[in-house]
C-alpha cells in the first residue's frame, strides 16, 4: 500500500425526508443561494417545491439557473457566474445529478476568479477560492455529490475536461433514495454503468498490495450487479435505490483510491466521445469498457482479471487463467447489454469511424501521451479500442 493523506470532508445526510435539514445547513454558509438544476424533472416530482418551501421558511433568498445540459457546458457556467456576481450569492445549491452538481462546482469556483471560467478548467491552479457548494442528489451515477471533481464541455473547441480543487467538494449532500424512483430506466442503466466504471478505473491498478481497497471495490461492483437490474424492474425498490446511491458516492470519493497508484483510462476515452457527439456518458463507458479490458489483457495483467472474475463474478478459480479472464469480460459485456439494456456498439449511438483518430489523439493529449495504470495505452492503441467498439 502506498502512502496517502485521507480527507473526505462532505457531510452526508442519507435517507428518507433528509431534505428537512436543508435550511439549517445552508444557513451555516450564507443566506443568498443560487439553485442549479437541469431540465425540470425536479419540478414534476415535487423536489423543487419542497426545497423552495424550506428556503422560504428559513428566509433564505434564492436565485435560479435552470436548463443545465446532460454534458454541462462552460457557457452555462458563465450564466451562473453572472447571476452570482450580480446578486451577491453566497452558496451554490445543486439539485439533480452529476451534470447539475458539476456545473454548480465550476460556477462556485469561477465566481472567485477574475477571468474566463474555462481558464480554471484548463488549469486548476488558478482556483484560489470556491463558494460553498451543497447538493441534493436525484440520480445515482457520477459521485459528484462527494468528490472534488467536475467535468465541463466546451462546444466551441470540442473539449470535455476535468476541473478539480479540494474546496469543490460539497459542504454537504442530501441523499434520499426515494428521489431516484422516477429516474427513467435508460438513465438508471447508464448511471449504474458509470458507477461501475469509476470502480474499474481504480481497481485495475498495478498496485498489488492494496488488499483492503480491492476487496471494497469488489463489494461495490457486486452491489451494482445485484441492484442495477432490480432498480430497472422495480423502480420504487428502496433497497435497490439506496444501495446504488451509496455505491455512487463511495465509488469515487477517494476511499478506493487511497493507498493505490491509479491513472484513469476509459473515462478519458469516453470524454472525447461525448465532447464530439454529446452522447450519454454512462452509455459510452459501457460500450468501451469490455473492449478496453480485452485490449489490455496479457500475461502481465491476467492476474487482475482472474481476481475480478473469481471475486466479483464467482467464476471457478481452478479454471485456466485466460479462460477466467475472458469469461469475466464477457459477463461484464452481457451485464451492460442484457441486464441494463445499454448499446454495445458506438454505431448504435451515431458514432462511426470518421473522427476516431482525432479523438484518440485528444484522449492522451493532457496526460503525457498515455492513459491507464495496469497497462497504459497510447493514442494508436486507443484508436484500436475505438475501432473494436464501432
UniProtKB/Swiss-Prot annotation:
- Family assignment from sequence similarity: Belongs to the iron-containing alcohol dehydrogenase family.
Write down any Gene Ontology CC term: cytosol
Instruction: Name the Enzyme Commission number(s) assigned to this protein.
Output: 1.1.1.-
Q: What more does the entry say?
A: Primarily NADH-dependent, although some NADPH-dependent activity was observed.
User: What is the organism lineage in this UniProt record?
Assistant: Bacteria, Bacillati, Bacillota, Clostridia, Eubacteriales
- Subunit comment for this entry? Homodimer.
Q: What is this protein called?
A: NADH-dependent butanol dehydrogenase B
Q: Which InterPro entries match?
A: ADH_Fe/GldA, ADH_Fe_C, ADH_Fe_CS, BDH-like
What GO biological process term is on the record, naming one?
A: 1-butanol biosynthetic process
Q: Give the record's keywords alphabetically.
A: NAD, Oxidoreductase
The GO terms this record gives for MF are: alcohol dehydrogenase (NADP+) activity; butanol dehydrogenase (NAD+) activity; metal ion binding; methylglyoxal reductase (NADPH) (acetol producing) activity
UniProt lists the gene as bdhB
Amino acid at each position: 500500500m502506498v502512502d496517502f493523506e485521507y480527507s473526505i470532508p462532505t457531510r452526508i445526510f442519507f435517507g428518507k425526508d433528509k431534505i428537512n435539514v436543508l435550511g439549517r445547513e445552508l444557513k451555516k454558509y450564507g443566506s443568498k443561494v443560487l439553485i442549479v438544476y437541469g431540465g425540470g424533472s425536479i419540478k414534476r416530482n415535487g423536489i423543487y417545491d419542497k426545497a423552495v418551501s424550506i428556503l422560504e421558511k428559513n428566509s433564505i433568498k434564492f436565485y435560479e439557473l435552470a436548463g443545465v445540459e446532460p454534458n454541462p457546458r462552460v457557457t452555462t457556467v458563465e450564466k451562473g457566474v453572472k447571476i452570482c456576481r450580480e446578486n451577491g450569492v453566497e452558496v451554490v445549491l445543486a439539485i439533480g445529478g452529476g451534470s447539475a452538481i458539476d456545473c454548480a462546482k465550476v460556477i462556485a469556483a469561477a465566481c472567485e476568479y477574475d477571468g474566463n471560467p474555462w481558464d480554471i478548467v484548463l488549469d486548476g491552479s488558478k482556483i484560489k477560492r470556491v463558494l460553498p457548494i451543497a447538493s441534493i442528489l436525484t440520480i445515482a451515477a457520477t459521485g459528484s455529490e462527494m468528490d472534488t471533481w467536475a467535468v465541463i464541455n466546451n462546444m466551441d473547441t470540442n473539449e470535455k475536461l476535468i476541473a478539480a480543487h479540494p474546496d469543490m467538494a460539497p459542504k454537504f449532500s442530501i441523499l434520499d433514495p426515494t428521489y431516484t424512483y422516477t429516474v427513467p430506466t435508460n438513465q438508471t442503466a447508464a448511471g449504474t454503468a458509470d458507477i461501475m466504471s469509476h470502480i474499474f478505473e481504480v481497481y485495475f491498478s498495478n498496485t498489488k498490495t492494496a488488499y483492503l481497497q480491492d476487496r471494497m471495490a469488489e463489494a461495490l461492483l457486486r452491489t451494482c450487479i445485484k441492484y442495477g437490474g432490480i432498480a430497472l424492474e422495480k423502480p420504487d425498490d428502496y433497497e435497490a435505490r439506496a444501495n446504488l446511491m451509496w455505491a455512487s458516492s463511495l465509488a469515487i470519493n477517494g476511499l478506493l483510491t487511497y493507498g493505490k497508484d491509479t491513472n484513469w483510462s476509459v473515462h478519458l476515452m469516453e470524454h472525447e466521445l461525448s465532447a464530439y457527439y454529446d452522447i450519454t456518458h454512462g452509455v459510452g463507458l459501457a460500450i468501451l469498457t469490455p473492449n478496453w479490458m480485452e485490449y489490455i489483457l496479457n500475461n502481465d495483467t491476467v492476474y487482475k482479471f482472474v481476481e475480478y472474475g473469481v471475486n466479483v463474478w464467482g467464476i471457478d478459480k481452478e479454471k485456466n487463467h485466460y479462460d477466467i479472464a475472458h469469461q469475466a469480460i464477457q459477463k461484464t459485456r452481457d451485464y451492460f447489454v442484457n441486464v441494463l439494456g445499454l448499446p454495445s456498439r458506438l454505431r448504435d449511438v451515431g458514432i462511426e469511424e470518421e473522427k476516431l483518430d482525432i479523438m484518440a489523439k485528444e484522449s492522451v493529449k493532457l496526460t503525457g501521451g498515455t492513459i491507464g495504470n495496469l497497462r497504459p495505452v497510447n493514442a494508436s492503441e486507443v484508436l484500436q479500442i475505438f475501432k473494436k467498439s464501432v
